[in-house]
Amino acid sequence: VGSEMCIRDRSDVMSYAYNGERLFEGYPVSGFSTVAALYMEQVQIVTCDPDIKSVADLKGKTVSIGASGSGVYYNALDILAAYDLTEEDINAQYQDFGNSADALQDGKIDAAFVVAGAPTVAITTLATAKDTYLVGLDDEHIAKLQESSPYYEEYVIPEGTYEGVPETKTVAVVATVIARDDVSEDDVYNICYTIFENMDNLAQSHDKGKELDLEFAASVTAVPYHAGAAKYFAEKGFDVPTK
């Protein structure tokens, strides 16, 4: 967490850090705790090729899977693995969301993994310029994915989120506020109070504010909660795990 009191992270990356896995292999980070879950960030597999209907169809294709070692990169590897594919089974490109969208529009890649709250600007822009499709995940492979990586949540992206794109089943990770353990209980309590006592105002000022929900906020399992957050949620009737 560095010098910041609190930052926003993702449930999968938090788990990697706390357990010393993947990009944190051999270097576990234990000095932070969960404050609250905010909203879901969906794994969106984007293509302009109507013949790519399943993750299995990505074999042999040119696919952007995010910067090497990034959270998106590991999300892509997890989903490929659920379909018995590896990084070597595709022509992997390591691009950010904007460059991936440009490459899709120009026909330079066949598909891209984008992990962000839907609607995502890069995909919205692409869908207005070119026929765009989201590649869905089926129940069998979602279950397989969750067995090895329980921080993935099933999620259905509604029809109309992007122009011409039907309802699509995928998975998501949770955008979460975390805090250093040495931040005072009162400070973290006040952060929770400020967010969740102003949900109506936040919903009016930001699309993601509409997704704020107390029960969801208290649902993180990847990393225990800060004592200040636990105090706030207890007042609202929710017990959360602490260190």
Can you say where each PLM-predicted feature lies in the sequence?
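Ligand-binding clefts/hinges and TM-proximal coupling segments of bilobed small-molecule sensing domains
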Residues: T62, S68-D78, P150-A222
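Short, small-residue-biased leader/transition segments that mark boundaries at the very start
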Residues: V1-I7
